Amino acid sequence: MKISKKATTIAVINQKGGTGKTTTCENLGVGLAMEGKKVLLVDADPQGSLTVSMGWQDPDALPTTLSTLMQKAMNDQCIPPGEGILHHAEGVDLIPANIELAGLEVALVNTMSREKVMKQVLDSAKREYDFILLDCTPSLGMLTVNALAAADTTLIPVQAQYLSAKGLEQLLQTVQKVRRQINPKLKIEGILLTMTDSRTNYGQQIDNLIRGAYGSKIKVFDQTIPRSVRAAEISAVGKSIFQHDPKGKVAEAYRSLTKTNY
């Protein structure tokens, strides 16, 4: 009997909203599935942005979400294989999220091994997939710490603007702290510049600034994700960029990111 390898778990993380985190999680996941990989996406954000973007427009109506599964883990209840997992037409699976996750984050504070509850939920799934991608909440609270404790690597999308670049320091300190105290194997996959505009001097300056400040310590992906109206539309259509605008520059960018780095 062939034993499948354990999935690589990637936390897509930035404590700042609007950096292209959900878009990256969705399109990297579908891109990997197009390469023949088995992919599980996990919406770890109470806003449920990834769930909505994948086509489940009313996350609050879903009977089982990440919150349900984490609550079961906290209560030492058995989680049957595949429970709560939704199947998307583009070949990826999803553990959805909704606002209940915000209440669960509060409950985590008084839980034993509170940083590792999400890891408990995902450990059984690691044998079934090649990649697990976590779309993290835009904060550095207990849910994000849980995601980092469950991850092998982190991917940091950064919008190509100065303030977004400034917030990187705090995020990197959190990653280092989790590595030191909870998950010594945690690596930083790299920084992905999103919503770039290479036609402007300002866009090029920010690109150079981030590469200059961090490039010697952390990989900054050569591939950047350009700003695009079509990419902004995908959360409303329930499809990835590969279905919505397959010949566009954003689809090409995510295709290149996937092929070159995974």
Protein language model regions, located:
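P-loop NTP-binding core
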Residues: 1-262
